[in-house]
Amino acid sequence: MMQKQSITQKLANPTRCMALSGTLLPWLAGIAVILIAYGLYRGWTAPPDYQQGETIRIMYIHVPSAWLGMMGYALIAVSSFGLLVFRHPLADVSAKAAAPIGAAFTMMALVTGSLWGKPMWGTYWVWDARLTSVLMLFFLYLGLIALRTSIEDESLASKLTAVLALVGVVILPFIKISVEGLSIPWLGLEIPAWNTLHQPSSVFRTDGPKIHASQLYPLLYSALGFTFLFFTLHMKGMRNEILRRRVKALRIAEVDRAREREAVAAAE
C-alpha cells in the first residue's frame, strides 16, 4: 500500500516545484507591484516628519531593504540546514537563489541608510555597531557567492557554502541586539543596547509602535510589497537554477552517450 506523501515531500520534487511556481509567479509579481506602488505613493504623500522633515521618505525603502537583507540570510541558513541534515533536494537550490537577492537588498539598505544618515548625523558613514554589522552581513553574502562559484564540484560547493552560512548566522541576532539589547528575564539574561547612533525599532516593540499612523501604514504596505518582490525573485531564481541543472545533466548525458558510441565504433 502506497503511503501518502506529505506537502514537503511533494514540493521536494523539482517537477512539482516548477509547476507550482509557474502558477504562483504572476500572482506574486502582481501583488508585489501593487503593494510597492501603493506604499511608496502613500509614503510620498504623507506629511513630513516633525524632526526629520522630508528625509523620512527614505524610510519606505530603507527599512524594507534592511528587513529583507536579514530575512534573506535567515532563509539561506534554514535552506542550508535542510541540505546538511535532511538532504532536501531543493534546499541547495533555494539557498543559491536567495544569496544574490539578499545581497542586493542588503546593499540597498546600506546605500539608503547612508543617504538618510548624511542629513541626520552629518556624515554618510560611521563605524556604528548597527552599520558595521550590516556591512559584515553584506560581506557574508559576497563570501557565500564567491565560495560557491570558486568550486567546480557542485556537491562540494553546496556543502561548504551551507556550513559557512550556518556559521555566519550569528550575525543576525548581533544586528538586532546592537541597538535594542536583549532581555530574557526567565534566564536572568540582560544585554544592554550598545552606544549607537542608529535608532531602535519604531514598529515592532513590546510597548507598541512609536511611529505615527500616517507613516506606519505606508511603511507596512511598502514592506509587505518588497517582501512579495523578494519571494517573486527567489522563486524565479529557483526555477532558473532547476532548469540550469537539467540542461547540465542533459549535456553530461549526451557527452557520455557520444563516448559510448566512439568506444563501440573503435571496438568494431
What are these regions (language model features)?
Residues 2-268:
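Polytopic transmembrane helical bundles with strong interfacial aromatic enrichment
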